[in-house]
Each structure stands twice: as C-alpha cells, then as structure tokens.
Regions:
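Non-catalytic DNA-recognition/assembly elements of restriction-modification systems
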Residues: 1-77, 212-247
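Short, contiguous, well-structured surface segments enriched in hydrophobic/aromatic residues
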Residues: 56-59, 85-92
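Sequence-specific dsDNA recognition surfaces
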Residues: 60-77, 92-123
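Short, well-ordered loop/turn elements at secondary-structure boundaries
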Residues: 82-85, 120-124, 151, 202
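A short beta-sheet element
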Residues: 90, 118-119, 127-176
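Generic recognition of stable, solvent-exposed alpha-helical segments in well-folded globular domains
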Residues: 116, 122, 150-153, 168, ...
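A short glycine-rich beta-alpha junction/loop motif
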Residues: 148-156, 190-215
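Short, positively charged
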Residues: 171-191
C-alpha cells in the first residue's frame, strides 16, 4: 500500500508527509496522545515555514508575559431569561466576529449589576466559544454597541493589554484565532467532556502566529477594524429599519 511505501521512503529521505501521513519527533508528543489530528499544525508550520516569518507563542505564554488576559463567564439560570433588556450572550449569539443584534435571552438590570464588575466587559475584548460543538473557537469583538452584556460560562473573554512587546492588537489576535493554523489546533485539542465538547484549559497550549513584521500586524489590524466597523454599521442599520417599520 502507498502508506507503507511512504513509510519506508521516509527512513532515507527528508519526507515531510502528505494527506496519508507525516513524521513527528517523539519529543513533540503531548501527554502520550497519538491521534494524528492532534499534530496537524506541525505539518502546516513546516509547509508554511512559519518559523521564518512569525513568532509562534502559546496562549499560555502570552498570559504569563502579561500580553493577554483570559476569563470565563457566568450562568444566570433559566428563570432569569426574559426578566429585562440586558443581553445574555451565549455561544449561539456569536457570528462573523460580532455579537448578534437579537440575542435570544435577555436578563434584568439587577442581574447585570451583580455581575458587571466581575465580568468587566470592555470594547476591544474578544469573546471566544469554549464549549459546544462546531462553534468552538468562533470569536466576536466587543464594541461600544454591546459592552453592556452578561456572557455565559461557555465563553472565554480575551483581553489584549496595550503596549505589549509584540505589538499585538485585539484586531490582529481575532484574525489569528480565525486562521486555519489556529483552527486546526482548536479542533485537535477539543475533547468530549461528559456530553459536551470542550476546549477547556487546553486553550493555553494553542500556538498563536505573530508576524515578525510590525507593518503586517498594523495592516491586518486595520483590515479587521474596517471589516468589523462595516459590519456594525450594517447591523445597526438593519436593526433601525426593523424598528422604524412600525413608526
């Protein structure tokens, strides 16, 4: 079979692998996990030669260095649903880097006030799906239009601290988190927990590609900012239209 042939060839050549298999240094094994999907990002790293163009830094190291902060949200219970006008943001409310304009569940001002200081939501924060199914890894940027929210426990809140040594911005980070290189890592590190899939604390093992060129970081940040700003305008216009139709 082709797989066996490739294996024997790999003993004598610089075989990097293909869709049928790839080689991995034993030192790169993670907690004896042998599932090939857990190491697909190594293949991408070699193919894209990311080591030459990017700093590959784990989220855990970015936290230790004070570049980013990560927290998770809270549950309010079903009895809180429909008690007010404050959005309770769940995994299904996140799409295309934004929070949907019509979240399914709204909660009271009192519940919001009891959690606002703890959750400390600010424009520029990133919400990322932590648990669920196909939505894990999906991201949204907090804006001035939706900073008054409560977000659930199945979401991470990621904050980029300004003036960090990498020049990293929240706009660049949300693009990096949405890249194929990071998506494959998220898929590889997502495991079933009881009856729900979860990324959990393994988010700290994910490698973030940060460009060595500050101009690239600035250009990508501007692209993302423009994309989000345009989407916000379209979202708010559609919301206004749906209100004005009854005026």
């Amino acid at each position: 079979p082709t797989v066996v042939k490739n294996y024997y060839n790999s003993q004598n050549t610089n075989y990097n692998g293909n869709e049928l298999g790839f080689r991995l240094n034993v030192d790169d094994l993670d907690n004896r996990v042998l599932a090939p999907r857990a190491y697909l990002h190594f293949v991408d790293k070699e193919a894209l030669k990311l080591d030459d163009t990017h700093k590959l830094i784990t989220i855990g190291d970015l936290i230790k260095q004070g570049v980013i902060e990560i927290n998770t949200g809270d549950e309010v219970g079903k009895l809180a649903y429909g008690t007010g006008n404050i959005p309770f943001v769940r995994t299904s409310d996140i799409s295309n880097w934004l929070i949907k304009s019509d979240p399914k569940h709204l909660i009271s001002e009192d519940i919001y006030n009891s959690l606002a200081q703890k959750q400390d939501v600010k424009p520029g924060d990133i919400l990322m799906v932590k648990d669920g199914s196909y939505l894990i890894g999906t991201c949204a940027m907090i804006t001035d239009f939706d900073k008054k929210i409560v977000y659930q426990s199945h979401l991470y809140k990621i904050r980029v601290n300004n003036d960090n040594k990498y020049g990293l911005t929240s706009y660049y980070l949300i693009a990096a988190l949405s890249s194929e290189f990071v998506k494959k890592q998220i898929f590889a590190k997502t495991f079933s927990q009881d009856i729900i899939n979860s990324l959990g604390d393994r988010i700290k093992d994910i490698l973030i590609p940060i460009s060595n060129e500050q101009n690239n970081i600035s250009n990508i940040s501007e692209m993302v900012k423009h994309s989000i700003t345009s989407s916000i305008k379209a979202r708010e216009l559609s919301r206004k239209a749906s209100i004005d139709v009854l005026s």
